[in-house]
UniProtKB/Swiss-Prot annotation:
The lineage of its organism: Eukaryota, Metazoa, Chordata, Craniata, Vertebrata. Belongs to the connexin family. Beta-type (group I) subfamily. This is Gap junction epsilon-1 protein. GO terms for biological process: cell morphogenesis; cell-cell signaling; lens development in camera-type eye; organ growth. Residues 1-23, 98-112, 192-205 are cytoplasmic.
């Protein structure tokens, strides 16, 4: 019986009841994971080692880098954002697997439809919060020069630091923000698809 639960859970996660949900999981989600795993770590892999300030002292470089990048690397935050957004859907499919609910029944029975819509709304909320945090922490652009306030180190001045591969990081930020925006739009479109199919279903009976 436990193997059947695992099978139902896997099928629910891989093949959600909506067409848009399937597109997000199988196609768009895969592209986003590939983008994070391959390009993200290639751009941010050795950022701390190449972050150099003037004067070039280890403690100054480390202090200013921590000030410049509050969460390191930025790819980790993006990966965490992706996982958190997927949690509500995974919990719903776990519930459906434990109740032995077929994917076809989710949009046919009102109680299951409401629960699924709530999980999508929760995904939208989490994605919006993560998007706001991403913009607040990282912005939309990475500049080549960072001015570090090093007064707490006893350096009574603003220290200039060079940011490595700033152009590539800017492109990565734009891409991540675009992915997040598309994700939110897909979740909203999924709700409209559910409503349409719920309204259309009685006419097929």
């Amino acid at each position: 019986m436990s193997l059947n639960y695992i099978k139902n859970f896997y099928e629910g996660c891989v093949k959600p009841p909506t067409v848009i949900g399937q597109f997000h999981t199988l196609f768009f989600g895969s592209i986003r994971i590939f983008f994070l795993g391959v390009l993200g770590f290639a751009v941010y892999g050795n950022e701390a080692l190449h972050f150099i300030c003037d004067p070039d002292k280890r403690e100054v470089n480390l202090f200013c880098y921590n000030q410049f990048r509050p969460i390191t690397p930025q790819v980790s935050f993006s990966a965490l954002q992706l996982v958190i957004v997927l949690v509500p859907g995974a919990l719903f499919h776990l519930y459906a697997a434990c109740k032995s609910i077929n994917q076809e029944c989710i949009l046919q029975k009102p109680i299951y439809t409401i629960i699924y819509i709530l999980s999508v709304l929760l995904r939208i909320s989490l994605a919006a919060i993560a998007f706001w945090l991403q913009i607040y922490l990282f912005g939309f652009q990475v500049k080549s020069l960072y001015l570090c306030d090093a007064r707490s180190l006893g350096e009574n001045m603003i220290i200039r630091c060079m940011v490595p591969e700033h152009f590539e990081k800017t492109i990565f930020l734009i891409a991540i923000n675009t992915f997040t925006t598309i994700t939110i739009l897909l979740f909203v479109a999924e709700i409209f698809e559910i409503i349409f199919r719920r309204l259309y279903f009685p006419f097929r009976q």
